[in-house]
Amino acid sequence: MANIKSAIKRAELNVKQNNRNSAQKSAMRSAIKAFEANPNEELFRAASSSIDKAKSKGLIHKNKASRDKARLASKLAK
């Protein structure tokens, strides 16, 4: 465990950020799975939105976001 006060604070913040990021990423995955189980326009918009939010927060790379959205759009079109 860290001894320096600022290091202790950073460690606590890292735990909070990790929890927040994990929840956001999990919500994104859940939205994608919901869409894949029942592809429709409403679930597509929700999944696409959650992917964009994860991208804007730096949780996923912009190219992965684009690839995922393209795959979802392809499934919606079928």
From Swiss-Prot:
Start and end residues of each stretch annotated as Disordered: 55-78
MF (Gene Ontology): small ribosomal subunit rRNA binding; structural constituent of ribosome
Keyword RNA-binding among UniProt keywords: yes
Record's keyword terms, sorted: Ribonucleoprotein, Ribosomal protein, RNA-binding, rRNA-binding
Function: Binds directly to 16S ribosomal RNA.
Name this polypeptide is given: Small ribosomal subunit protein bS20
BP GO terms, sorted: translation
InterPro entries: Ribosomal_bS20 (IPR002583), Ribosomal_bS20_sf (IPR036510)
Gene: rpsT
Source species taxonomy: Bacteria, Bacillati, Bacillota, Bacilli, Lactobacillales
Entry's Gene Ontology cellular component terms: cytosol; small ribosomal subunit
Disulfide bridge map: none
Stored Pfam families: Ribosomal_S20p
Family note: Belongs to the bacterial ribosomal protein bS20 family.
